[in-house]
Regions:
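Glycine-rich helix-loop-beta junction characteristic of Rossmann-like nucleotide cofactor-binding loops
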Residues: 71-79
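A catalytic-pocket lid/entrance helix-loop region that shapes and gates access to the active site
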Residues: 128-134
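Active-site substrate-recognition segment that forms the wall
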Residues: 1-43, 52, 57-60, 66, ...
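Helical element adjacent to the flavin cofactor pocket in flavoenzyme catalytic cores
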Residues: 62-72, 197-236, 242-246, 252
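Short glycine-aspartate micro-motif
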Residues: 48, 84-86, 249
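Flavin (FAD/FMN) cofactor-binding and adjacent substrate-gating region
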Residues: 13, 25-44, 118-120, 148-226
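Short beta-strand to alpha-helix junction loop
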Residues: 56-63, 134-148, 202-218, 314-319
Length: 349
């Protein structure tokens, strides 16, 4: 589709003055080959693994939670109320607990009750930095998860921090290329991107923004209202896990699954972020090459790093400054030939 809005959208103010501008870092819980969503028996106990979603945790959350519920149903007679432990209080644990709690007695155990990886996520709905098997069955499962997740996010709306957005790109998106067309249709093809200085040809993908501070707070509040309050617990070994009194255990420990369940396929991928002050009127998303900009109600989130096998939640001020400069240059219409020399940039992945 060839399209052009004609209107010029406002560009961000990239002024970074503390304390309103904050540098952050998050570690994506990436898994080689595919995310893990399956049952692993341990004697009389069953662990349902739900981890390895990389940068797509919020995106896939409801779909994976729905899949977890279906796996639980295979373990118990129909209509039986079970005692279920959920490990992890990030988005995967919270959404799984939310769907399980109406029909089961759910307890959440986590080493972090807040301040999880999900809390520093950007929030665009797109399956980024996540793998799945190439088989037809695995592709179908992945696409079904995306369909369910998108539908459940969209149906919850603003009270869960969800709003429709157009994501503008210079080139076709690899992440959106994984999404079935009945979920996110083919992008609008634009003669010019709709910004004052960023006017190259591009595309517009109709997707969602899921704002983590609103979404996660709502999940936690709703669970607490139903009597499900996460408990602090540190698990160092599988024996610690299967020592729980619950016989069904949902493992949503993300990156921690690598050491806890001896999974060598789990790899940390650190991303640097700059949180600028919130700015009214920026009702769009942008992601291409070395930078992405996600305006939200709490911050304008600027990112673009991909540090493979780096597990460090301490922001790197130099890299954050680079990311901010690149985003500023993009929206000023400036090109930068030297960017490819930096291997940690998102554009190289």
């Amino acid at each position: 589709m060839q399209a052009s809005t004609g209107a010029v959208l406002p560009s961000p103010d990239f002024t970074c003055t503390p304390p309103g501008c904050v540098f952050k870092a998050g570690v994506r819980p990436y898994r080689l080959d595919t995310y893990r969503l399956e049952i692993q028996p341990f004697g009389s106990k069953n662990v349902i693994h739900n981890y390895g979603h990389g940068g797509a945790g919020i995106t896939m959350s409801w779909g994976c939670a729905d899949a977890v519920v279906k796996l639980v149903q295979t373990l118990i007679p129909g209509g039986t109320r079970a005692r279920i432990a959920v490990l992890g209080a990030g988005v995967m644990g919270l959404t799984a607990a939310t769907l399980l709690a109406p029909n089961h007695d759910v307890a959440i155990y986590a080493d972090r009750l807040t301040g999880t990886t999900s809390d520093v996520a950007g929030g665009q709905w797109a399956p980024s930095v996540v793998e799945y098997h190439a088989s037809t069955k695995a592709k179908q499962q992945f696409e079904d998860i995306l369909r369910t997740a998108y539908r459940m996010h969209k149906s919850r709306g603003p009270s869960f921090g969800v709003s429709p957005r157009v994501n503008y790109t210079k080139v076709k998106s690899v992440s959106f290329g994984k999404v079935p067309l009945d979920v996110v249709p083919r992008p609008d093809r634009l003669k010019h991107l709709p910004f004052q200085h960023l006017t190259s040809p591009g595309f517009g993908y109709h997707t969602l923004l899921v704002e983590p501070p609103i979404f996660l707070a709502r999940l936690r509040a709703d669970l607490a209202a139903g009597g499900v309050i996460p408990q602090h617990r540190v698990f160092k070994t599988v024996q610690d896990v299967i020592g729980l009194s619950e016989t069904i255990i949902i493992n949503c420990t993300g990156l921690g699954s690598g050491s806890l369940f001896q999974d060598p396929n789990v790899v940390p991928i650190t991303g640097q972020l700059v949180w600028l002050p919130a700015q009214a009127g920026l009702d769009w998303l942008y992601s291409t090459d070395q930078t992405y900009v996600f305006p939200r109600s709490d911050h304008v989130v600027v990112g673009g790093s991909y540090e493979y096998n780096v597990n460090d939640e301490n922001p790197d001020p130099a890299k954050c400054a680079d990311i901010l400069k690149m985003a500023r240059d993009v929206f000023a219409g400036r090109a930068f030939a030297a960017a490819d020399a930096r291997p940690w940039l998102m554009r190289n992945k």
